[in-house]
């Protein structure tokens, strides 16, 4: 497949800017970096709630770190497997994907995602990665109707779950709850895919693929009865971005938890050291035998050295492998961790999930977040032409007139809010305390 096809944009551009010698992917990176959606990540929850501490990561700092790790993966792959250099010809592609990968995540992290998915249960669902695709291709006002108007290859790379909602959603949904406060997140997991409202754009992205490649790329599998189906494949660029995201989540969120005293050295010893000291890889055995001495040291530079050692260990354990069944090179090859390091990364991810994500104090914040989001959605849908801001009202009215999914407009609006703005808006709507109009002067 010729490179020019993957460089194409949905809306042709003839911008002639003074002395602008950037390539298409450098332009994509700039559009993402300078977007309002990217800036809002500075006030969105990563794991720990915004405002809990000045040290921890937000979605913005997480995305910057993912970008650094992603470019590091690309650099070491170019050295390690130079035969793939033609496919790794642009650092800006990887930077773009890593910077953009969380743009669609709503306020209050996973709690906000569950809340919007529940409120959209009869209207195509909600999921953060699907919303990222939607922001890049429709919502961000770089163009009037085409979002950021990014290159086809960039959009292919952002597709972590390349299949429509309707093909993946389980047949028998759970019964709705009588009151929002009874909602259990485990019963309403989002479908990881693209919204059916955006199928025409997905078709455009996949247009260069052969019929066989497209069919295979869109395929899914059943995990277990009663669960949503899952997609199987992703592009090479996406596989690099996803590895960078996983490494940042496992290692840097671990660092936040250690610094804030959320996890103890004994918990680390029980759940990580005892497992990875028996790893099949000698490097992992040796490092994890003594890693706790540095990770939990009172000397900050020792902890930082341990974190850097972990990141470097994972980045240098990645190789490009062939994926059977594809002709298109961007799909035929994926980056993957060596098996022992893949196990180690999953051990770290499970440790963070068990002792950080599932910590009652964190779950209380998540619970509060999904109550706020659901009550905002209920208010807006009750009287959209009265409560929605003017720009969003216009989109809602146009959607109604055209017979489109108007609920999606409200999901778009709420998902774009920062944690603080959503909480403040909720207070203005539902708290007896009065507030000024100026405090709510925020259009997306």
Curated annotation (Swiss-Prot):
Highest rank taxon of the organism: Bacteria
InterPro entries for the chain: dGTPase, dGTPase-like, dNTPase_2, HD/PDEase_dom, HD_domain, PHydrolase_assoc_dom
Gene Ontology biological-process entries: dGTP catabolic process
Keywords in alphabetical order: Hydrolase
GO MF annotation terms: dGTPase activity
Domain HD: 59-250
Annotated family: Belongs to the dGTPase family. Type 2 subfamily.
HAMAP family (UniProt xref): dGTPase_type2 (MF_01212)
Protein name: Deoxyguanosinetriphosphate triphosphohydrolase-like protein
Upper classification of the organism: Bacteria, Pseudomonadati, Pseudomonadota, Gammaproteobacteria, Alteromonadales
């Amino acid at each position: 497949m010729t490179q020019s096809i993957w460089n194409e944009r949905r809306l042709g551009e003839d911008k002639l800017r003074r002395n602008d010698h950037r390539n298409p992917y450098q332009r994509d990176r700039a559009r993402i970096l300078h977007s309002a959606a990217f800036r809002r990540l500075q006030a969105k929850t990563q794991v720990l709630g915004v405002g809990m501490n000045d040290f921890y990561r937000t979605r913005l700092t997480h995305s910057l770190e993912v970008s650094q790790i992603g470019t590091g993966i690309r650099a070491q792959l170019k050295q390690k497997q130079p035969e793939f250099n033609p496919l790794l010809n642009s650092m800006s592609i990887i930077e773009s994907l890593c910077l953009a990968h969380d743009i669609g995540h709503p306020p209050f992290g996973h709690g906000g995602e569950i809340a919007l998915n529940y409120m959209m249960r009869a209207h195509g669902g909600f999921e953060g990665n699907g919303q990222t695709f939607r922001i890049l291709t429709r919502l961000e006002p770089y163009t009037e109707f085409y979002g950021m108007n990014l290159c086809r290859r960039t959009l292919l790379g952002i597709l972590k779950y390349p299949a429509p909602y309707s093909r993946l959603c389980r047949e028998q949904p759970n019964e709705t709850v009588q009151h929002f406060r009874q909602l259990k997140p485990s019963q309403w997991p989002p479908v990881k895919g693209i919204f059916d409202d955006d199928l025409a754009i997905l078709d455009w992205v996949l247009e260069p693929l052969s019929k066989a490649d497209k069919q295979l790329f869109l395929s899914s599998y059943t995990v277990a009865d009663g669960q949503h189906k899952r997609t199987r494949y992703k592009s090479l660029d996406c596989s690099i971005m996803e590895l960078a995201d996983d490494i940042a989540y496992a290692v840097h969120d671990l660092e936040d938890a250690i610094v804030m005293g959320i996890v103890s050295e004994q918990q680390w010893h029980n759940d990580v050291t005892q497992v990875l000291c028996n790893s099949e890889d000698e490097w992992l055995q040796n490092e994890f035998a003594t890693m706790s001495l540095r990770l939990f040291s009172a000397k900050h530079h020792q902890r930082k050295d341990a974190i850097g050692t972990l990141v470097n260990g994972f980045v240098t354990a990645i190789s490009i492998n062939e994926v059977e069944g594809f002709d298109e090179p961007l799909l035929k090859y994926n980056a993957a961790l060596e098996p022992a390091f893949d196990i180690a990364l999953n051990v770290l991810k499970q440790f963070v999930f068990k002792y950080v994500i599932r910590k009652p104090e964190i779950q209380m914040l998540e619970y509060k977040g999904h109550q706020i989001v659901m009550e905002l959605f209920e208010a807006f849908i009750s009287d959209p032409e009265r409560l929605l801001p003017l720009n969003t009202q216009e989109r809602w009215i146009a959607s109604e007139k055209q017979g489109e999914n108007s609920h999606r407009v409200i999901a778009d609006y709420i998902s774009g809010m920062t944690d603080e703005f959503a909480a403040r808006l909720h207070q203005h709507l539902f708290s007896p305390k009065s507030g000024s109009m100026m405090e709510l002067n925020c259009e997306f």
